[in-house]
Amino acid sequence: MEIIARIHTDLPTKFGLPRQSGLVEELEGLVVFEPKYREPEALRGIEGFSHLWLIWEFSEAKRDSWSPTVRPPRLGGNKRMGVFATRSPFRPNPIGLSCVKLLGVVKTADQGLALRVGGADLMDGTPILDIKPYLPLADCRPEATGGFAAEKAGYSVKVDFPAELLEKVPESKRTALKALLAQDPRPAYQNDPERVYGFGYAGLEVRFRVSGDRLEVIEVEET
């Protein structure tokens, strides 16, 4: 299986990533194709679709062996579920699936046509294995149930972002950052209100702590 593209986002590490695609639609990414796959003809007709499926590789989660059970973050990291009942990266084949919004096909200076997308849950440089259109007729299932994952649907925290710190963030990046923080990036099993967490975003290091349902940004620095 070949890598056909890589996505470039403002998140250089796993920490801070949305837990699923579509949760932070404001988070943009650019899918840049490998030289072999930069044929404009390969994208003919793609503008007619509002959303795409990205099939990608968990490049940071490769292991020599696999376990039939994993600890889903949504269950606090303490309860085991079958690997095929989860979207854990620790799988026999480390392949991920994300539904993203197609914001446009753009022409780059030296890398051919690229796809501008919104709502990706991928770190910068993630390898893309395939791209397919989202088909509402086939892919939307209104009667579907979400198992244990439905228990945490809609969870968010209130974000306190002091104005003097927010000013350090480029204006075009603020909305997505606040939306990311509202998703509470902490591991689900950590709830120490005094602990300081941090993650990289758009060339910045953002540090925060969480108490109850309130997240407070305490530092923003250039990396």
What are the residue ranges of the model-derived segments?
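Mixed-charge, low-complexity intrinsically disordered regions
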Residues: 1-95, 107-116, 120-223
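Conserved positions in beta-strands of structured domains
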Residues: 8, 100-103
